[in-house]
Design a protein with these regions (language model features):
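C-terminal catalytic core of tyrosine-transesterase DNA break-rejoin enzymes
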Residues: 62-68, 72-79, 142, 146, ...
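Active-site catalytic microenvironments for nucleophilic, acid-base chemistry
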Residues: 6, 10, 153, 171, ...
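Non-catalytic DNA-binding core/recognition domains of DNA-processing enzymes
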Residues: 1-7, 112
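Catalytic-site neighborhood detector that most strongly recognizes the C-terminal catalytic loop/helix
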Residues: 96-105, 117, 139, 174-177, ...
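Active-site/catalytic core of tyrosine-dependent DNA strand-transfer enzymes
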Residues: 43-50, 92, 101, 111-159, ...
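Basic, Lys/Arg- and aromatic-enriched nucleic-acid-binding interface segment
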Residues: 9-83, 91, 102-106, 126-127, ...
């Protein structure tokens, strides 16, 4: 844009600047800032997930259990590490994350699988605070480094914890007939259609 404006100012070209952003390209292209802020997290191919989960289930430590829970529930790191016993209904096998802890600001309900329930049972045996995965020194949530260190121990420096959400999304899209709307709801993503989102009241 600057180069063409310079040429136009020196009358080396005429007809306006086709690369002008304001009032021109801004009307048809996404904001450069949005593209700059968008990050892609390295993910494990879903074909390798069964083997990975088998190894992870045999790995000791709270970090390993937290990572398992994060993968099984397709939650964000902060959501899983901040999980409280008061949010979990063991009888009905549902984990309800309050809107205050959700990125989209909307309460998120997650049905708990048998594997997730097993992890909760293991953590309940060593319960020391209201947090499911507490820092043993102060009772607060364990740090993000806990799960990342597990990946390093398992020699998976090439992937990130957040990347497992992409693994989940890829599997659902390529191996199931699950509607996109349901998959997005499982990831607690906001509906793209603002009018539809305004009337959204249920879990799906």
């Amino acid at each position: 844009e600057a180069v063409l404006s310079y040429a136009e100012a020196h009358k080396w070209r005429t007809g306006g600047n086709p690369a002008r952003w304001r009032g021109h390209l801004s009307a048809i292209l996404p904001s450069p800032q949005k593209l700059k802020d968008r990050k892609h997290h390295s993910a494990l191919p879903y074909s390798e997930l069964p083997q990975f989960m088998g190894i992870l289930s045999k790995t000791d430590g709270m970090g390993a259990r937290a990572l398992e829970m994060t993968i099984l529930t397709a939650t964000r790191t902060k959501e899983s590490l901040g999980a409280k016993w008061s949010e979990i209904d063991l009888d009905n096998r549902v984990w309800t994350i309050p809107k205050e802890r959700m990125k989209a600001g909307i309460e998120h309900r997650i049905p708990l699988s048998s594997q997730a329930m097993k992890i909760l049972s293991q953590m309940a045996e060593h319960k020391m605070s209201d947090y499911v995965f507490p820092n043993r020194s102060n009772g607060k949530p364990m740090s993000n480094a806990g799960m990342s260190s597990v990946l390093k121990r398992l020699e998976h420096n090439d992937i990130t914890v957040h990347g497992f959400r992409s693994t989940f999304r890829d599997y659902v899209a390529e191996k199931t007939n699950t509607p996109e709307r349901t998959a997005e709801a499982a990831l607690a993503h906001k509906l793209k259609d603002a009018s539809e989102a305004a009337y959204q009241r249920g879990d799906l």
